[in-house]
């Protein structure tokens, strides 16, 4: 069974080169139809061997999940707002590589990634087997996700934060995508000082 959460510090051998490359990518304009705050790069950041490195760490061969923004970067400033909140990811496993400057990571209010419990149901993740699903009283996962996650995503009073993984330059956070999570608020006033991350959405490698 995959670990629900793993933190790997000092992940890249040259994180400053990755950061420069991430900032050099083209980014979509804020509010261009997505639900998240901030803006995503229009192409992936090229980091040689990242899929293989994560595969070795968890002991399962992984590839980028089709239909996701695997490898793309996200830039979020303090002023950016989004429509969605707590969510799950459409992937086998998820990851976030933090690329904000060290001095910005330690400023008050500079958050990493938050994990939540749904107050009404007591759930911290989507059930992973039939027995767990039956215990929730829901007949299928679609109904559960629709009425727990999608319905309450933007209602903070429905959720209790159970953990915040602090942001740290060159920290890789790996986690089960079925845990209820959300990015902590953005920060900074420009790309240099903002919240900069590389998004990773993994699928099992074919073959």
Residue positions per predicted region:
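Catalytic core of non-heme Fe(II) oxygenases with the double-stranded beta-helix
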Residues: 79-207
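Non-heme Fe(II)/2-oxoglutarate
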Residues: 1-84, 109-113, 119, 128-132
């Amino acid at each position: 069974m995959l670990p629900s959460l793993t933190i790997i510090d000092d992940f890249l051998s040259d994180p400053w080169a990755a950061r420069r490359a991430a900032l050099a990518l083209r980014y979509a304009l804020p509010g261009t139809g997505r639900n998240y705050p901030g803006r995503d790069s229009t192409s992936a950041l090229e980091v040689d061997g990242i899929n293989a490195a994560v595969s070795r760490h968890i002991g399962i061969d992984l590839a980028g999940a089709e239909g996701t923004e695997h490898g793309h970067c996200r830039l979020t400033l303090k002023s950016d707002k989004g429509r969605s909140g707590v969510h799950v990811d459409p992937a086998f496993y998820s990851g976030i590589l933090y690329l904000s400057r060290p001095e910005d990571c330690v400023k008050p209010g500079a958050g990493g990634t938050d994990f939540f419990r749904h107050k009404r149901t007591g759930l911290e993740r989507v059930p992973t087997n039939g027995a767990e699903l039956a215990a929730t009283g829901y007949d299928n996962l679609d109904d559960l996700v629709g009425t727990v996650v999608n319905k309450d995503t933007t209602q903070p009073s429905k959720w209790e934060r159970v953990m915040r993984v602090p942001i740290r330059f060159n920290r890789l956070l790996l986690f089960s995508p079925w845990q209820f999570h959300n990015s902590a608020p953005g920060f900074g006033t420009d790309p240099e000082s903002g919240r900069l991350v590389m998004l990773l959405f993994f699928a099992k490698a074919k073959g």
